[in-house]
């Protein structure tokens, strides 16, 4: 009986070992599956994190592009307003240039007229009134006279026609204005033609 008991025990033992091996194999298989699932989850998490980072980068780039576009539109609007303002201010420039000879001729007529002659007096008064009205009208649109007699010579506003020595004037001073200059809204339309003291 002892052999039989041993045999049974050996058979039982083999069965137990076999079952234990099956359980161990199943445990290893389950562990491998869990590891695989964990690896898949880690891979999925890494993939999702990469996608999130990529999306955040795209959003930031798009926000930057939107800000740049807004700034560009604002700059364009400001430049356009400045150009329109300049166009308004200086649209009359060519027209003003054409009117200057008329003003010059009216002034020459006033200077050349004999104010003492009775026949000429009413005509002279009419020319003076016409000149005043004309100058007032163009000054409303920003045209101003440059008459620098006695002032320091400034090449931005004056054109030196001659230079002469003069004990009565300081050096580099306008002694005489040959032709008045004009400016339109701060921009010189025609410089004053002057004689400068040496």
Swiss-Prot record:
Organism superkingdom: Bacteria
Q: Which Pfam families match?
A: GrpE
Supply the PROSITE patterns for this chain.
Answer: GRPE
Keywords on record: Chaperone, Cytoplasm, Stress response
Record's subcellular location: Cytoplasm
Q: Which GO terms describe its biological process?
A: protein folding
GO CC annotation: cytosol
| Matching SUPFAM superfamilies | Coiled-coil domain of nucleotide exchange factor GrpE, Head domain of nucleotide exchange factor GrpE
Q: What's the main place this protein lives?
A: cytoplasm
A single Gene Ontology MF term assigned here is: unfolded protein binding
Physiological role: Participates actively in the response to hyperosmotic and heat shock by preventing the aggregation of stress-denatured proteins, in association with DnaK and GrpE. It is the nucleotide exchange factor for DnaK and may function as a thermosensor. Unfolded proteins bind initially to DnaJ; upon interaction with the DnaJ-bound protein, DnaK hydrolyzes its bound ATP, resulting in the formation of a stable complex. GrpE releases ADP from DnaK; ATP binding to DnaK triggers the release of the substrate protein, thus completing the reaction cycle.
Check the record and name the HAMAP family matching this protein. Answer: GrpE
Family label: Belongs to the GrpE family.
What is annotated about its quaternary structure and interactions? Answer: Homodimer.
Could you tell me what this protein is called? Answer: Protein GrpE
Per the UniProt entry, what species is this protein from, by scientific name? Vibrio harveyi
Q: Which gene encodes it?
A: grpE
